[in-house]
Amino acid sequence: MIVLVKFFVILKIKKTQLLLGFLLLSIYCDRPGEKIIIKGSTMGTSYVVKIVSNKDIETKKIKYSIDSILVKLNKQMSTWDPESEISKFNRWESLEPYDVSRQFYEVVESALYLSKKTNGMFDATVFDLLSLWGFGPNPKSGIPEKKNIDSILTLTGYENIICSNGTLMKKNRKAKLDLNAIAKGYGVDVVFDFLRTSGFENIFVEIGGEVKFSGYNFRDQNWTVGLENPISNQIDKQIPLFGVLKNEGCAIATSANYRNFVDLDGTILGHTINPKSGFPIQTDVLSVTVISKTCMESDGWATALMTMSYEQGASILSGNDSVSAIWLMRGADGLRYITMEGDINIIDPIYDIR
């Protein structure tokens, strides 16, 4: 009898331990558990995806899906691929409607919308202009002559492309598109949407510096994004960031000339071209960071605002509650300062905010 009682007590203790262990496991799994980082290459740059989830993450399967998405987008919008959708459209010299994929149409439609909002300072028809200045898949060499720039300007202008019922039409047979200023942002949005529809909530997606995120990071806090400090001397190299953004779910993109430039006969030129004058911009704006709901919108606005003075950009954004911007400026005295438009939470800025 004593043996049976002892056995019963031991059995009950083990059951209690199992139940307690199960409860502890359940509590643990209710919190963000598994954390993964996926890296790869796309659109001539790199991408990083971070996921925090309380469910099993099939990393290889997710990476395969992400790579498939990005390969498809690259095949649609890469001007470096002669067989891409955009390259074929650029060779099309007809005024008849041209059938395009849904995603390609969406990006072009958004580009034209942004062109109208910025009075043409964002222009996706600058393919030949960029090539003339040494950018793009078939760059020319040397500083171009003004007559050649003026000749190309007769072929550019967003008014030369029409979106209608899923097709594109050219008003000028020689018009050519370049979507590099908006395609990376669109790629971020598409990957982000794929992860959300796959059931993930704590996500961080970055392609070439353009980011979109939601939920919480690996430390169970809001995601943070560093604001890159443009390098112009040895002191700048010691201070890689000029501030940190700590916003809840949003999309962020930055445009600046320090990342992409070309050396033409000893002259260093940034890749941001004024689409109206045809010349690289000369400005006291060092960089523009834009925050909005979609990364495509942030990407496009950042490029557009980089072509303008701060006063012009702030005037256009005034009253636009869906877009916020941070300008890093160089003052007349050579000192840097920050100015902003919209609702922005910037932490630890190293320059004055004016």
Segments (PLM) and residue ranges:
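Mature catalytic core of soluble alpha/beta enzymes
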Residues: I2-I13, I27-R354
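Bacterial N-terminal signal peptides
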Residues: Q17-S26
